[in-house]
């Protein structure tokens, strides 16, 4: 019988870890990058293409799905997996970040967040209990606790108050998750560390989460405008504050060099809209750095996006053809650019897993930094 949730570390190299998360719907190799399926789709890609690119798990957005098509409707279809045709693990976020960043007229209280939908202005209330209910209706494999994510640059008092509220919501999320006994028996719940950039606040947050008890732990409150140096500053201490025998998930990150730097600091899981959003806007990620295929210099370029990439896009089509598709606004352009980017991100994760396993991660990191030119 497949386990509900089990995490094993197969190799370490410095703080970097390679391992496997085993769940009933399949294994997730770590370090792992999760393509984002905001509205029950990884934009511009079919599920089979996402899997063929190397993804073991994708992410779904509770906020977007609760508004359209609604969690209750997806439950009638048999859950998010059947609805979208993806049979492997899905992690769903709690909806807290999107509520604060996308919704108009939000009102926070100890109970939760009251908000108006950005789609039609309808009124909703999202609480830890409702977030757990929605994620249960979706049939999520990895459920995220409901938290409050303050913007970058908040003062110490606001950061502390926000962290403490998130910890109270974490306890309510735990109780709400456990109340759904049938779903809880086959899925996992992750807690989210908060505390802004403050080491002591994050230590308190981690201690509280560990006391509550979770299957995995996320590092929240980053990638909100603080910049890479500040983010890495937090990652120099935050992962070590969390249990070594549980997965560590850095939410909303990020650029390829962010991923390499975070893995070097002990992070196991990532998600970000960047590869899909960038693909739709004509930006490709390559081992030599990002390139904007819209630029006129690519019009006559007969080379692939990345000569060292083995994805279907790079083995068939030229930069010149992709330039034409994107400039002409053809749907295929967004599809092919996205497909390449998802392949590149998964190839990057595999390269890091291999480097950790063979004890050469430091050399890989140095070589990557020397070659990759950040836009």
Curated annotation (Swiss-Prot):
Residues involved in substrate binding: 93-97, 147, 194, 221
Listed GO MF terms: metal ion binding; tRNA-guanosine(34) queuine transglycosylase activity
Binding site for Zn(2+): 309, 311, 314, 340
Residues spanning the signal sequence: none
GO cellular component: cytosol
Leading EC class: transferase
Keywords of this entry: Glycosyltransferase, Metal-binding, Queuosine biosynthesis, Transferase, tRNA processing, Zinc
Active site per UniProt: 93, 271
Cofactor notes: Binds 1 zinc ion per subunit.
Region feature RNA binding, mapped onto this chain: 252-258, 276-280
InterPro entries: ArchSynthase1/Queuine_TRR, TGT, TGT-like_sf, tRNA_ribo_trans-like
Superkingdom of origin organism: Bacteria
Pathway(s): tRNA modification; tRNA-queuosine biosynthesis
EC numbers: 2.4.2.29
Catalysis: reaction(s): 7-aminomethyl-7-carbaguanine + guanosine(34) in tRNA = 7-aminomethyl-7-carbaguanosine(34) in tRNA + guanine
Subunit structure: Homodimer. Within each dimer, one monomer is responsible for RNA recognition and catalysis, while the other monomer binds to the replacement base PreQ1.
Described function: Catalyzes the base-exchange of a guanine (G) residue with the queuine precursor 7-aminomethyl-7-deazaguanine (PreQ1) at position 34 (anticodon wobble position) in tRNAs with GU(N) anticodons (tRNA-Asp, -Asn, -His and -Tyr). Catalysis occurs through a double-displacement mechanism. The nucleophile active site attacks the C1' of nucleotide 34 to detach the guanine base from the RNA, forming a covalent enzyme-RNA intermediate. The proton acceptor active site deprotonates the incoming PreQ1, allowing a nucleophilic attack on the C1' of the ribose to form the product.
Family statement drawn from the similarity comment of this UniProt entry: Belongs to the queuine tRNA-ribosyltransferase family.
Protein name: Queuine tRNA-ribosyltransferase
Organism listed in the record: Sphingopyxis alaskensis (strain DSM 13593 / LMG 18877 / RB2256)
Lineage: Bacteria, Pseudomonadati, Pseudomonadota, Alphaproteobacteria, Sphingomonadales
Gene giving rise to this polypeptide: tgt
């Amino acid at each position: 019988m497949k386990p509900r949730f089990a995490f094993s570390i197969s190799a370490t190299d410095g703080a970097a870890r390679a391992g496997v998360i085993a769940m009933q719907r399949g294994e997730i190799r770590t370090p792992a990058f999760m393509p984002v399926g905001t509205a029950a789709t990884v934009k511009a890609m079919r599920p089979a293409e996402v899997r063929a690119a190397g993804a073991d798990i994708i992410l779904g957005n509770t906020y977007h799905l609760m508004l359209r098509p609604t969690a209750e409707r997806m439950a009638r279809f048999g859950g998010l997996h059947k609805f979208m045709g993806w049979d492997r693990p899905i992690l769903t976020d709690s909806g807290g970040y999107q509520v604060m960043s996308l919704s108009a007229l939000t009102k926070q209280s100890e109970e939760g967040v009251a908000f108006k939908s950005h789609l039609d202005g309808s009124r909703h209330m999202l609480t830890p209990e409702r977030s757990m209910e929605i994620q249960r209706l979706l049939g999520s494999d990895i459920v995220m606790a409901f938290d409050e994510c303050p913007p970058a640059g908040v003062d110490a008092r606001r950061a502390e108050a926000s962290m403490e509220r998130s910890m109270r919501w974490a306890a309510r999320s735990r109780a709400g998750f456990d109340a759904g006994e049938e779903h809880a028996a086959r899925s996992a719940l992750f807690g989210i560390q908060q505390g802004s950039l403050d080491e002591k606040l994050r230590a308190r947050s981690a201690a509280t989460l560990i006391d509550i008890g979770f299957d995995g732990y996320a590092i929240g409150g980053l990638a909100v405008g603080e910049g890479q140096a500040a983010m890495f500053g937090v990652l120099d201490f935050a992962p070590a504050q969390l249990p070594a025998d549980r997965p560590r998930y850095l939410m909303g990150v990020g650029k390829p060099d962010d991923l390499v730097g975070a893995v070097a600091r002990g992070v196991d899981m990532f998600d970000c809209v960047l590869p899909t959003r960038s693909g739709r806007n004509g930006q490709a990620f390559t081992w030599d750095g990002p390139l904007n295929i819209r630029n006129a210099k690519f019009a006559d370029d007969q080379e692939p996006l990345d000569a060292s990439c083995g994805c279907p896009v790079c083995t068939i089509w030229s930069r010149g053809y992709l330039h034409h598709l994107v400039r002409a606004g053809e749907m295929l352009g967004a599809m092919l650019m996205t497909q390449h980017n998802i392949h590149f991100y998964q190839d990057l994760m595999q390269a890091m897993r291999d480097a950790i396993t063979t004890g050469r991660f430091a050399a890989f990191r140095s070589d990557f930094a020397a070659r990759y030119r950040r836009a």
